[in-house]
Amino acid sequence: MRANPLASAGIIESEDRSPRLILAANRSHWNIERGPRLERAVFRNDLTPAQALDLCISTNGEMDIVTEVSPADAARVIASEFVKLVVCDANRVLLGIINRYPSDVPLQDRRVRKALNLAVDRQKIITIGLAGYANPLCALTASWCGGFSAGMEPYPHDPEQARRLLHEVGWPAGRNLRIAAPEPFGGIAQLVAVDMQSALDIGIDVIVVPQEKLLAGTRMLVEKKLIPSWDILIFGWFDLSSEAPPAAIHREFFGSDGAFRAGPELPEFNKLYAEMAAQIDGQKLVKVAEQSDRYVYDEALALFLCAPQALYAVNKHVNFGPYRTTFELAETEVDEEHWSRRGAREGSQAAQATQTSGKGGSASFASGSSGNAC
């Protein structure tokens, strides 16, 4: 029994969003150099992602920015006359959670976990599965983040070595390896399965979890009352900081209170994490973060795949600079040809012409930028 049995994790069970959310510029903000540079931003919650993307790429004035564009839709964005594709090396990871709970397969053995990593061609997954919009990962820390160990290299694609390691340990005859994935990652799971079946000479079952069953599966993983039936779960996660990834990524997958830990606690990881959490010296913190990532890599605690890039469809008259962490609009601005400014300018010119040729009166008229975005 755990000494501290209480923990929490964020699971969205349902959402009740207003059709539109409007952010208005705060002209009294202390950091005026940063922004805002827009008068308002309107978030459209009354559209599906597909509807939003269709409006963005086929119209001018309906939708300025669409986030989370699928790599499968990137070519449509590039071909549009109204928008451009903005690509960002984001703090995201795509991996396979390995079920280390005791079972009839030896996934608690490091050699087997290494065999799984050696069996997969990561570049093929990036090229075919993500249309090239991803970066290779060594473990769970991207190369641009603090805590990345410069000496590490991603696991190579080495089917012979993978097969040798698996044969050293042994695999139960007739037992297929079970790979699960939510629907968006079903294609990735199939690519992983093909590589593993070829390299390891074992049967593979791919289980694509439909959206309506995803919440129940997530609760099982987070609550840890039941042992999942899958051996590997293809999963994506993110980090809100580039300084110490183990705080938001490694801990969630391997920490004592990690929501996505699938297996017994790891005393060595807990020790490293406790040391990192207590650091007040920045350089020492980064060093321990590197050690944590190295430990995860050496133990092959997950199937390390890649760091997917964040893709945005952005109106060609919007200057949007993406962040690696979150969706930010503080520095976003629109040029003179943006539909919101062009409309205001044309209205101003018409009003001015009317007043000049009319009977006098106030010279006030609309000016400036509405700068509607999203």
Residue ranges and their predicted role:
Residues 29-32, 102-112:
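Short helix-loop capping/hinge motifs at secondary-structure junctions, enriched
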Residues 1-42, 48-50, 159-160, 164, ...:
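Gly/Pro-rich hinge or "lid" segments in bacterial periplasmic/extracellular proteins
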Residues 16-20, 25, 89, 94, ...:
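Detector for C-terminal structural segments
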Residues 50-64, 76-80, 110-111, 190-201, ...:
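Short helices/loops that flank or line small-molecule/ion binding pockets
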